[in-house]
Amino acid sequence: MESFSSKSLALQAEKKLLSKMAGRSVAHLFIDETSSEVLDELYRVSKEYTHSRPQAQRVIKDLIKVAIKVAVLHRNGSFGPSELALATRFRQKLRQGAMTALSFGEVDFTFEAAVLAGLLTECRDVLLELVEHHLTPKSHGRIRHVFDHFSDPGLLTALYGPDFTQHLGKICDGLRKLLDEGKL
């Protein structure tokens, strides 16, 4: 007997459509203004660090695609109880990473690239486990690309260095606002 599910088909079509349209207009349906500002700053940091506009655009586009796909999966109730526990764990790790990044940005001489890189790597691993059965290997590659890029000790060291002070300040302001509003 053939198993057919219109809900599954609709979800698959929605993910496919959104993956093709991961531009600003679609992103604003899922990503608020503060998050958008943080993403813009992360783009600028990536562009300055890599000296490559296309590479910086690719990493932010991958981040947006993954965020939208995970939001769609969550909104459609695609996660089972064990996956919801993983989603909670991911959110806690992401929140811990944001608070650590803020702390490093606010207290001089406390920055440790290995600590922040480790937290981002843990976030990546939990997210990959969460979406293992829901997203394609290509999407898994996007997750790895995003987290590997931002957990690069060289990039983190540059971000907390003197050349990126203005960017770090804006990122910290955005993270603080997202934490205060309970969005992170």
Curated annotation (Swiss-Prot):
PTM characteristics: Phosphorylated by TAK1/MAP3K7; this phosphorylation triggers association with BTRC and subsequent ubiquitination and degradation.
Outcome of swapping S3A = Complete loss of interaction with BTRC
Q: Write out the annotated subcellular location.
A: Cytoplasm; Nucleus; Lysosome
GO biological process per UniProt: innate immune response; negative regulation of inflammatory response; negative regulation of T cell activation; regulation of apoptotic process; T cell activation
The tissues in which it is expressed are: Expressed in T-cells, B-cells, macrophages, neurons in the brain and brainstem, and stratified squamous epithelia of the esophagus, cervix and skin.
The record ties this protein, via Gene3D superfamilies, to: Tumor necrosis factor alpha-induced protein 8-like (1.20.1440.160)
Transmembrane segment boundaries: none
Q: Which UniProt keywords apply?
A: Cytoplasm, Immunity, Innate immunity, Lysosome, Nucleus, Phosphoprotein, Ubl conjugation
One GO term describing the cellular component: cytoplasm
Q: Which InterPro entries match?
A: TNFAIP8-like, TNFAIP8_sf
- Which sequence positions carry the modification called Phosphoserine? S3
KW Cytoplasm (keyword) present: yes
- Assigned protein family: Belongs to the TNFAIP8 family. TNFAIP8L2 subfamily.
What does the entry's free-text domain comment contain? The central region was initially thought to constitute a DED (death effector) domain. However, 3D-structure data reveal a previously uncharacterized fold that is different from the predicted fold of a DED (death effector) domain. It consists of a large, hydrophobic central cavity that is poised for cofactor binding.
Instruction: Give the quaternary structure.
Output: May interact with CASP8; however, such result is unclear since PubMed:19079267 could not reproduce the interaction with CASP8. Interacts with RAC1.
Its function, per the record, reads: Acts as a negative regulator of innate and adaptive immunity by maintaining immune homeostasis. Plays a regulatory role in the Toll-like signaling pathway by determining the strength of LPS-induced signaling and gene expression. Inhibits TCR-mediated T-cell activation and negatively regulate T-cell function to prevent hyperresponsiveness. Also inhibits autolysosome formation via negatively modulating MTOR activation by interacting with RAC1 and promoting the disassociation of the RAC1-MTOR complex.
Instruction: Please state what the protein is called.
Output: Tumor necrosis factor alpha-induced protein 8-like protein 2
Which organism was this protein described from? Homo sapiens
